[in-house]
UniProtKB/Swiss-Prot annotation:
Lineage: Bacteria, Pseudomonadati, Chlamydiota, Chlamydiia, Chlamydiales
HAMAP family assigned to the protein according to its UniProt record, in alphabetical order: GTPase_Der (MF_00195)
Chain ranges of the KH-like domain: 386-470
Domain EngA-type G per the UniProt entry, residue ranges: 2-166, 212-385
Domain of life according to the entry: Bacteria
Name of protein: GTPase Der
InterPro entries with a match to the protein in the record: G_ENGA (IPR031166), GTP-bd (IPR006073), GTPase_Der (IPR016484), KH_dom-like (IPR032859), KH_dom-like_a/b (IPR015946), P-loop_NTPase (IPR027417), Small_GTP-bd (IPR005225)
The protein's assembly and partners: Associates with the 50S ribosomal subunit.
Family (UniProt): Belongs to the TRAFAC class TrmE-Era-EngA-EngB-Septin-like GTPase superfamily. EngA (Der) GTPase family.
Length: 474
């Protein structure tokens, strides 16, 4: 894999260049200095080889900013792991003392280095290129990331230095979701219409060879980045005790037991009244987008604090988007005199959505139960990727109906003729009944809880669809 690191002092347009190269808005772009704090990873496609772009935070070694030592460490780590380095400057400012200091350190690494003179929006700006050679870097390209100007020249220069052959990307065939065959039972046709059958009803949206996208969601300062760093045994995300340290959604690809995981570390959701600037607002909205993008969500809460209304709000967002999820109760090492099973029992009683969730008590600091995260993710993914056999669904419901008979309404009783596991995304069962008017909310909840317990659907938001049907006569 070819790795390209983008480096430079604050506010020279590194994130704008990163987004142009990756052709998507991954990094938060704003005129405020220090917007990017962690290393961000993006992917370039169509080069014929895997290419990864690393966006680093703005380097300012002399700054008294509380985060600068962390940002500098992250930027240096990005430079060390990269094959090609891009030093970005603001051509309108010329070569500053800090630019020269950064260039000196990068030249010391003896790696291919390109000086990217950004914000060359006019011809007058481009004419200043001759002033830049005094920095000691022979490869110089002028660009305007915000106007998508000369990005192609920069790409060509990178390919030349990396000996990447030019390839013509063939048009990709449009992908369609594969239908997962259902099990055939002769009696099924009594309830399914001519344009409706089990084979076409059930489908999976997941693709086996793609990494599982795992979003870590939670309020600021609950330990999301600490969990990722503990899992990966590497400091990839800046950690501090000041709430809101992570602002960008950070994509981190990781392999464990021959399975790939793409962890999305998100900025913490905040109360809207505390969102004081556009950066915080963008970060909050990105958290919601990360939920939509994820295959599985990990909601991180703090064991030392009571469950807040915003923890419940986040869980509500996850559940409404029908995302499989696990609640990670972090900082369990700080809890004394409480049995774990009692804590989980009491936690389930605090909220409807939590009562339906899978819960793990962990500690990023001591690494307690961290490996259970992977096994729980795999178990949850297997559940939502597998079809529940139709005979099993029907036997489970038959036993439930036998155990608790539906109540009689106007001389009639609810009858469930047949049921199938209809779809995986969202997870849904289809039940054929005699009349919806005979289905009470209480009995619907009873059937749903029965299926949840029988098929271990804790952490899997699912629906029951009811369809009125009478047996077909020939």
């Amino acid at each position: 894999m070819l790795r390209i690191a983008i480096l430079g002092r604050p506010n020279v347009g590194k994130s704008s260049l990163f987004n142009r190269m990756c052709k998507r808005s991954l990094a938060i772009v704003n005129s405020q200095e220090g917007t990017t704090r962690d290393r961000l990873y993006g992917e370039i496609r169509g080069w014929g080889i895997p290419v990864q772009v690393i966006d680093t935070g703005g380097v300012d070694k002399d700054s008294e900013d509380h985060f600068q030592k962390h940002i500098y460490k992250q930027a240096l780590a990005g430079a060390n792991e990269a094959d090609i380095l891009l030093l970005v400057i603001d051509i309108r400012c010329g070569i500053t003392e800090l630019d020269a200091e950064i260039a000196k350190q990068l030249l010391y690494l003896k790696k291919p280095l390109i000086l990217v003179a950004n914000k060359a929006d006019t011809l007058k700006d481009e004419y200043r290129v001759h002033e830049l050679y005094k920095i000691g870097i022979s490869e110089i390209v002028t660009v305007s990331a915000s106007h998508d100007k000369h990005i192609d020249k920069l790409i060509h220069k990178i390919k030349t230095l990396a000996n990447v052959p030019e390839v013509v990307e063939e048009p990709r065939e449009e992908m369609h979701e594969e239908e997962v065959p259902g099990m055939e039972f002769p009696e099924t046709k009594e309830f399914l219409s001519d344009d409706e059958d089990e084979d076409t009803a059930f489908s999976q949206s997941s693709v086996a060879d793609k990494p599982l996208k795992i979003a870590l969601i939670g309020r600021p300062n609950v330990g999301k980045s600490s969990i990722i760093n503990a899992l990966l045994n590497e400091e990839r995300c800046i950690i501090d005790n000041v709430p809101g340290t992570t602002r960008d959604n950070i994509d981190i690809l990781y392999s464990h037991n021959d399975r790939s995981y793409l962890f999305i570390d998100t900025a913490g959701l905040r109360k809207m009244k505390s969102v004081k600037n556009s950066i915080e607002w963008i970060s909050s909205s990105r958290t919601e987008k990360a939920i939509a993008r994820a295959d599985i969500c990990l909601l991180v809460i703090d064991a030392t604090h009571h469950l807040s209304s915003y923890d419940k709000r986040i869980l509500s967002l996850i559940s409404k988007q029908k995302k499989p999820h696990i609640i990670l109760v972090n900082k369990w090492d700080l809890i004394e005199g409480v049995r774990m099973e009692h804590y989980i029992r009491d936690l389930r009683a605090t909220d409807m959505y939590i009562g339906q969730s899978k819960i793990l008590c962990i500690s990023a600091a001591t690494k307690r139960n961290l490996r259970q995260i992977f096994s729980s993710i795999d178990e949850l993914h297997t559940t939502v990727s597998s079809k529940v056999p139709t005979p099993v669904v029907n036997k489970t419901l038959a036993l439930a109906l036998q155990k608790h008979h539906p109540q009689v309404i106007n001389g009639r009783r609810l009858r469930v003729y047949y049921a199938i596991h209809k779809t995986a995304t969202p997870f849904q069962f289809l039940l054929f009944i005699n009349a919806k008017s005979l289905l009470t909310k209480h009995y619907e909840c009873y059937l749903k809880n029965t299926l949840k317990s029988a098929f271990n659907l804790y952490g899997v938001p699912f629906d029951l669809e009811f369809k009125e049907k009478t047996k077909r006569t020939n």
